[in-house]
């Protein structure tokens, strides 16, 4: 782990945000600019996962330069639901991830645009039973963040509250960012590729993945389970499967051997169909086919997350004022010329 003041190239580590199974997330400074720094653990599987994620994030990141970036700079920026990747080095690089040797050990890292907020698991500790509307909107937003993976028939397979950063907007609504894209693999590639018991959080991992079943049984519905169990935790006020002070093997056994629906314990939500959505999302079989279908089910009950009021960039006001002055100037010149023509004709 890195500590305050450590340098990774030109990046100064200022704060540890979270340690995950395959990487750690830090706040860092590049000069005077705040960024987020993700560093893979010194392991080939962890490094390859971060490299793969960096390529996907680059493909998904909005253009920051060129005509499209110039036009976008004048408009209110929508809040991203995925991290925006930045160049790994201060100079140009063909790679979107960085590689550097730190104290004799090769490390792979990526640099992300800074985002403020609290990790969802910390937020749940502060408020174990989040208002069910906000909980549903968080899950719906995370599902939409996974849309590019779903459309490519890729699985995340590592969703947990620890990889979600949540900020509160000016209206008090919770706005999440999915800070990690997971393994980004097809279900057919799952079998034997990774040690899931070591690289996944068993309390939030689909039982079929932990039970080492055949690869053909692993699909997009595995991520439905993870979002469903997070939704359950926010509604019920406690985890579906307690992981604190317990070994992974114990949690894994609880998940794979559970045969009973987990009770939400919220009678007021049953009539609206919320409990049925949760039950279907975390059922051993018969889940929603993917997270987008889960999002549709929640939207049918709660509607879509409310649009966020975003600050209008100052440069738009400057542009409008400049255009106003130019138009006024053109009008004055045109009026003066017209007046001169009329005076000359009157002579």
Predicted regions and their residues:
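Conserved catalytic-loop aspartate of Hanks-type protein kinases
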Residues: 223
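Protein kinase catalytic-loop region centered on the HRD/HxD motif
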Residues: 144-154
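ATP-binding glycine-rich loop module of kinase domains
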Residues: 29-59
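Conserved C-terminal C-lobe helix
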Residues: 269-282
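Conserved activation segment of eukaryotic-like protein kinases, specifically the C-terminal portion
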Residues: 194-209
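Activation segment signature within eukaryotic-like protein kinase domains
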Residues: 138-139
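Conserved short submotifs of the Hanks-type protein kinase catalytic core
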Residues: 103-119
């Amino acid at each position: 782990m890195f500590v305050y003041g450590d340098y990774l190239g030109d990046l100064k580590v200022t704060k540890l945000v979270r340690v995950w199974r395959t990487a750690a997330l830090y706040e860092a400074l590049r000069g005077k600019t705040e960024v987020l720094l993700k560093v893979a653990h010194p392991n080939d599987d962890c490094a390859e996962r971060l490299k793969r994620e960096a390529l996907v994030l680059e493909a998904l990141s909005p253009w920051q330069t060129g005509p499209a970036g110039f036009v976008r700079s004048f408009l209110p920026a929508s809040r991203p639901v995925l991290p925006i990747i930045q160049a790994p080095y201060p100079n140009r690089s063909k790679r979107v991830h960085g590689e550097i040797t730190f104290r004799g050990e090769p490390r792979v890292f990526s640099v992300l645009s800074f985002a403020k907020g609290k990790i969802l698991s910390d937020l749940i500790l502060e408020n174990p039973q989040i208002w069910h509307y906000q909980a549903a909107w968080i899950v719906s937003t995370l599902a939409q963040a996974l849309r590019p993976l779903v459309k490519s028939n890729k699985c995340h397979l590592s969703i947990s509250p620890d990889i979600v950063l949540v900020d509160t907007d000016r209206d008090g609504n919770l706005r999440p960012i999915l800070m990690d894209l997971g393994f980004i693999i097809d279900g057919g590639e799952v079998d034997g590729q990774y040690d899931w018991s070591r690289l996944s959080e068993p309390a939030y991992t689909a039982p079929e993945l932990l039970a080492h079943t055949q690869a053909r049984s692993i699909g997009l519905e595995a991520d439905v389970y993870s979002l469903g169990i997070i939704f359950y935790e926010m509604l019920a006020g406690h985890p579906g499967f307690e992981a604190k002070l317990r070994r992974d093997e114990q949690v894994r056994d609880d998940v794979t051997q559970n045969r009973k629906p987990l009770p939400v314990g919220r009678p007021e939500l049953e009539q609206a169909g919320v409990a049925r959505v949760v039950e279907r999302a975390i059922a051993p079989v018969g889940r929603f086919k993917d997270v987008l279908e889960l999002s549709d089910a929640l939207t049918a009950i709660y509607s879509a997350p409310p649009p966020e009021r975003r600050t209008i960039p100052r440069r738009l006001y400057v542009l409008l004022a400049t255009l106003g002055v130019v138009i006024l100037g053109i009008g004055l010149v045109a009026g003066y010329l017209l007046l001169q023509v009329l005076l000359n004709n009157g002579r």
